[in-house]
A protein has these predicted regions:
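Nucleotide-sugar-dependent glycosyltransferase catalytic domains
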Residues: 1-175
Length: 175
């Protein structure tokens, strides 16, 4: 279990940002290989890959390898919108407006992607036999097109953005 292997106490207690990032990169690379191998075995005979925010990159790679559709499922908004800023990005003042709200999603996605990019490339090459994803990320991968994205939150708590298309579905909480 990767959670048991990660010992981040020393880097965190030391407060050294570079040491923290270096440790996380090493753990992500080791984890990515295990996740790709386990995911490949788990997907044998499946018709669909489902991935959320923590596994979206390996989910995309598995869907590409197996030529399966990918259903994205998230607990927080992950699709860019002008309605409000990304929950993964520092809070923006309300006067920043819609364009910067939308940009905050792109920036949050890029921060996630760049942190995981080398691990994803390793898993794609060594386990899945795939080429590396784009420097900018796999967000335009074919397996992401045309399929619904499910959001497990209440529209009474987080309103469905009016600029999302018909593929985005706010379903209410998942318990």
């Amino acid at each position: 279990d990767i959670a048991q292997r990660i010992d981040m106490r020393a880097p965190l207690e030391g407060g050294n940002f570079l040491a923290i990032m270096s440790q996380m990169a090493r753990e992500a690379q080791q984890g990515a290989l295990a996740w790709a191998k386990g995911g490949l075995a788990a997907c044998h005979g499946m018709d669909l890959v489902i991935a959320g925010i923590g596994g979206v990159f390996i989910g995309i790679a598995l869907a590409e390898k197996l030529r399966l559709p990918l259903l994205q499922a998230y607990y927080i908004p992950f699709t860019p919108t002008r309605a409000y800023p990304s929950f993964l990005f520092p809070r923006l003042p309300p006067w920043f407006g819609g364009a910067l709200n939308r940009l905050s999603y792109q920036l949050a996605r890029q921060m996630m992607w760049q942190g995981f990019r080398s691990a994803d490339g390793l898993a794609r090459r060594d386990v899945l036999g795939l080429p590396s994803a784009s420097f900018w990320g796999p967000f335009n991968a074919e397996c992401l097109q045309y399929y619904p994205i499910l959001y497990g939150f209440s529209p009474s708590v987080i309103p469905r953005p009016p600029d999302w298309d018909g593929n985005m579905h706010v379903t209410g909480y998942w318990f």
